[in-house]
C-alpha cells in the first residue's frame, strides 16, 4: 500500500515495505566493500544509454536535443556531493515513483534473504536493486531526470521511509537523461578524491561502452610583470591620486628628457611573478576500449600490445595472444596473453591463482575467480566477457555455475591451441618453454583430461640432441626398430645424468635417452604412462627389459650361475642395506650400480623428498624401498672379487672392498651416502694398502706442541657489571 501526501511544491510517497526493509539493512549494517556503489550506478547509466541508443535506431528524432552519449562524474568537496550524470533515456514522473520506491522489484526480498544469510553485498545488482547501493555512502540521494515524453522531475529521499517527487525548476536543465546527486556521509569523503574515483572506474567500469568523464581540476602557472599592478593603480579614482601643483607646472622639456636608455632600465626593473590559475575540465577515464569486442582481423599488433600493457602493467610486450569468441547456447568473448617472462613469485602459495579478469557485459566482476582457469595456467593473462552470467554473481554461486565450467573448458582448449601455434615459431617457443615449462609439467600432473595434449608440448635434452630440445613425438619418430620403450633418466643436472653408468648399454645399442633434470619432471613422468603407444621406461629402475639374442641369453645365464656365490657373499656383507644382489646387463664399463624397484622412488626423487621440510614420514618410509645391487658379471673387479671371496670369506680386505663398492655405487647411482665418515675411512685404508702401510699404525703426536695449561680454578677476569 502506497500513501501519498501532496503539498503545493511536492508529492510525498511512502516506500514499499520490502524496499524500506532493504534500505534499513543497507544503512545500518557494515559492509567493507562499499565501493561497489559506483559500479552499480555507472552500470545503470550505461543501461539507460543502451535504451536510448536502441530507441534512436527506430526513431532518430529521439536524440535530436542531445545527440551525445556520455556518463559524467562531478565531485563537489564544498557541498560534499558526488554527481553521476548520463544522457540516457531518462525517467518520467511515473518512472521515478514506481521504479524508485513504490513498486518493489521481484528480486528485492530474495536479495534481502541472501544478504541476511551472509552473501556478498556486491550481489545487489543481480536482483535489480543496484540503485539502492547509493545509500552505502550517501545519507541523502537526489535524482534529477528528464525523459523525452515528460518534463524534468526531481526525486529525493533520505531513506527514512518516504521520498518526494516534484517538477524540477531549481536544478540545471537536462536535455535528456538522469543526474544522481549523492550527499555523502561524513566518513565517506574519500569518494570525492579524483584519485579514488579514477581507481574505481579503472577497476570496475573501464570497458563500459560509453565514455565516462570526470571533472578534474587543472592548475596552470603563468608569469606576469608588474604592469598589471600599475594598470590597477591607473584605474584608481582621480581623487585618490596625489596632486602636486609643481608637477603640473613642469614643462614639456623635462618630460621629454627621458632617454631610450632610461626606458630600457625601467623595463629591467619591472619584477615578474607567477600567477596560479585553477580551471576545471572533463577528463575521459575509459579511453582503453574493449578490443575483445572487435573482430581479431580488425585489431593490430600495436593495439594488442597497448591493451596488454594497460591490463597488466607489464613493461614488455606480450609473447603471444589468442583472441576468440564462443557463440551458440553460451556466448562469451576472451582475449588471452602469454607474457614474455614468468613472475618471480609464480608458485607462491599465497599468490593469486589466476590473472584472468571476468567481465559480464563489459562490467568488471572479479579477478580472483579460482574456478575460471586451472592453476597450471595461472601465468596466462587476459579478460573474459560473458553475456550469459548474471551481473554481480557471488563467488559462492559462481563456483557452482555450469556456465563457468564451460568457459573454463574453452579457455584451456584455446590456451593449448595458442601454445601449439607457438611451436611453429621456434625462437618464440624456446622463450616460452624456458619461462613456463614448469607450468606445463604441473598441467601433466593435474589435468587428466588434457594430459596427452600437454605432453606433446614437452621438450627435453637427450643423449643425441646436444643443446637442442626434443619433443616426445620427435623422439618416437626416430626410435630404433628394435626399441620397445621411450627411455629416460632423472637427475640433478645434465652433467650428472650424462655420465651415469645406467646409460652404458643403451648408448652401446644406439638408443636415445631423455634427460629429465627438472625436479618437477619426477612428478610429471609418473602421470605419462605412454606416448603414441610407446611406454616410458626409467633406466635407473629394475626391469630394463632389453632384447637379447639366444646366444647372448645362454652366455649371460652361464655368467649368472658363475657369479651366484659372489652375489650371496655381497648380500651377507651388506645385510639389510640392499634387498638383493643380482647380475645385470645394463653396464659395459661400470662394475655395479644400485637400482630401485619399478614402483618405488628413483634416486633423484628420494633426494627431492628428503629435502621437503613438511614431508609425511610414513609415506617416505614406505616409498624408500630397499635398493637392488646390480653387478656387471663381465667386469674384472667382480671376477677378482669372486676369486678372493671364494678363497677366504672372512678376508677383511674383501669386506672393505664390498662396502667400498656399495658406497661408490650409491654415489654413481645418484644417492646420498648413508655414512660419509665410514666411506672416508675405507678410502684411507685403501690408500694405506696401496702405499704398503700398516693399517694399525697410529699417527705420531706432534712433540713441538706445548702442553695444555692446568685448568684455572678461580677466574682472574674482572667482573663485568
Swiss-Prot record:
Q: Where is the composition biased (Acidic residues)?
A: 223-232
UniProt xrefs under Pfam families: HATPase_c_3 (PF13589), HSP90 (PF00183)
Q: Where is this motif: TPR repeat-binding?
A: 717-721
Coiled-coil residue windows: none
SMART domains on file: HATPase_c
Localization, UniProt = Cytoplasm
Q: Where does ATP bind?
A: 44, 86, 105, 131, 395
Q: Which NCBIfam families match?
A: PRK05218.1 (NF003555)
Q: What is known of its domains?
A: The TPR repeat-binding motif mediates interaction with TPR repeat-containing proteins.
What protein does this entry describe?
Heat shock protein 90
Classification from the root reads: Eukaryota, Sar, Alveolata, Apicomplexa, Aconoidasida
Amino acid at each position: 500500500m502506497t500513501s501519498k501526501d501532496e503539498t503545493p511544491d511536492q508529492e510525498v510517497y511512502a516506500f514499499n515495505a520490502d524496499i524500506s526493509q532493504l534500505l534499513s539493512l543497507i544503512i545500518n549494517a557494515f559492509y567493507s566493500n562499499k565501493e561497489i556503489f559506483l559500479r552499480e550506478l555507472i552500470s545503470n547509466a550505461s543501461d539507460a544509454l543502451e535504451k536510448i541508443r536502441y530507441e534512436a535506431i527506430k526513431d532518430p528524432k529521439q536524440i535530436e536535443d542531445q545527440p551525445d552519449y556520455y556518463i559524467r562524474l562531478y565531485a563537489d568537496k564544498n557541498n560534499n556531493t558526488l554527481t553521476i550524470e548520463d544522457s540516457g533515456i531518462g525517467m518520467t514522473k511515473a518512472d521515478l515513483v514506481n521504479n524508485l520506491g513504490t513498486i518493489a522489484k521481484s528480486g528485492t526480498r530474495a536479495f534481502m534473504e541472501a544478504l541476511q544469510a551472509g552473501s556478498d553485498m556486491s550481489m545487489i545488482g543481480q536482483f535489480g536493486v543496484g540503485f539502492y547501493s547509493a545509500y552505502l555512502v550517501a545519507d541523502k540521494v537526489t535524482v534529477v531526470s528528464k525523459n523525452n515524453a515528460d518534463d524534468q522531475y526531481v526525486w529525493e529521499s533520505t531513506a527514512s521511509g518516504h521520498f518526494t517527487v516534484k517538477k524540477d525548476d531549481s536544478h540545471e536543465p537536462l536535455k535528456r537523461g538522469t543526474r544522481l546527486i549523492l550527499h555523502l556521509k561524513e566518513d565517506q569523503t574519500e569518494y570525492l578524491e579524483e584519485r579514488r574515483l579514477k581507481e574505481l572506474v579503472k577497476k570496475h567500469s573501464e570497458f563500459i561502452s560509453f565514455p565516462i568523464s570526470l571533472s578534474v581540476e587543472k592548475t596552470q602557472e603563468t608569469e606576469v610583470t608588474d604592469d598589471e599592478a600599475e594598470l590597477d593603480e591607473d584605474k584608481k579614482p582621480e581623487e585618490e591620486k596625489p596632486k602636486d601643483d609643481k608637477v603640473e607646472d613642469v614643462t614639456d622639456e623635462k618630460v621629454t628628457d627621458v632617454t631610450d636608455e632610461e626606458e630600457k632600465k625601467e623595463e629591467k626593473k619591472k619584477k615578474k611573478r607567477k600567477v596560479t590559475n585553477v580551471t576545471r575540465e572533463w577528463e575521459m577515464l575509459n579511453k582503453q576500449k574493449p578490443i575483445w569486442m572487435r573482430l581479431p582481423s580488425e585489431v593490430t599488433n600495436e593495439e594488442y600490445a597497448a591493451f596488454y600493457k594497460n591490463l597488466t602493467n607489464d613493461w614488455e610486450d606480450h609473447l603471444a595472444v589468442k583472441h576468440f569468441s564462443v557463440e551458440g547456447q553460451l556466448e562469451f568473448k576472451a582475449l588471452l596473453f602469454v607474457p614474455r617472462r614468468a613472475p618471480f613469485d609464480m608458485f607462491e602459495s599465497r599468490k593469486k591463482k589466476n590473472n584472468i579478469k571476468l567481465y559480464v557485459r563489459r562490467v568488471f566482476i572479479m579477478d580472483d575467480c579460482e574456478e575460471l582457469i586451472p592453476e597450471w595456467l595461472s601465468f596466462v593473462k587476459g579478460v573474459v566477457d560473458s553475456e550469459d552470467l548474471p551481473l554481480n554473481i557471488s563467488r559462492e554461486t559462481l563456483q557452482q555455475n555450469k556456465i563457468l565450467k564451460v568457459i573454463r573448458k574453452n579457455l584451456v582448449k584455446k590456451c593449448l591451441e595458442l601454445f601449439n601455434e607457438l611451436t611453429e615459431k621456434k625462437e618464440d617457443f624456446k622463450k616460452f618453454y624456458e619461462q613456463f615449462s614448469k607450468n606445463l609439467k604441473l598441467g601433466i600432473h593435474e589435468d587428466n583430461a588434457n594430459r596427452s595434449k600437454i605432453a606433446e608440448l614437452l621438450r627435453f635434452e637427450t643423449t643425441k640432441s646436444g643443446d637442442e630440445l626434443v619433443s616426445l613425438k620427435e623422439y618416437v619418430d626416430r626410435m630404433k626398430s628394435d626399441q620397445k620403450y621411450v627411455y629416460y633418466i632423472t637427475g640433478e643436472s645434465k652433467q650428472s645424468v650424462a655420465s651415469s653408468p645406467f646409460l652404458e648399454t643403451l648408448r652401446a645399442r644406439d638408443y636415445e635417452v631423455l634427460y629429465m633434470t627438472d625436479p618437477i619432471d619426477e612428478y610429471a613422468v609418473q602421470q605419462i604412462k605412454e606416448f603414441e603407444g610407446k611406454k616410458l621406461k626409467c633406466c635407473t629402475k629394475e626391469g630394463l627389459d632389453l632384447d637379447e639374442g639366444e646366444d647372448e641369453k645362454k652366455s649371460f645365464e652361464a655368467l649368472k650361475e658363475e657369479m651366484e656365490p659372489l652375489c650371496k657373499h655381497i648380500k651377507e656383507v651388506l645385510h639389510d642395506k640392499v634387498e638383493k644382489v643380482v647380475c645385470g646387463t645394463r653396464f659395459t664399463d661400470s662394475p655395479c650400480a644400485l637400482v630401485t624397484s619399478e614402483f618405488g622412488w628413483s634416486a633423484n626423487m628420494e633426494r627431492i623428498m628428503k629435502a621437503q621440510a613438511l614431508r609425511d614420514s610414513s609415506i617416505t618410509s614406505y616409498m624408500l624401498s630397499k635398493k637392488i645391487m646390480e653387478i656387471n658379471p663381465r667386469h674384472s673387479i667382480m671376477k677378482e672379487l669372486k676369486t678372493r671371496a671364494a678363497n677366504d670369506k672372512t678376508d677383511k680386505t674383501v669386506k672393505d672392498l664390498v662396502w667400498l663398492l656399495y658406497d661408490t655405487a650409491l654415489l654413481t647411482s645418484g644417492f646420498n651416502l648413508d655414512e660419509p665418515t665410514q666411506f672416508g675411512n675405507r678410502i684411507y685404508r685403501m690408500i694405506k694398502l696401496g702405499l704398503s702401510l700398516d693399517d694399525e699404525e697410529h699417527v705420531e703426536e706432534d712433540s713441538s706442541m706445548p702442553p695444555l695449561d692446568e685448568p684455572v680454578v678461580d677466574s682472574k677476569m674482572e667482573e663485568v657489571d
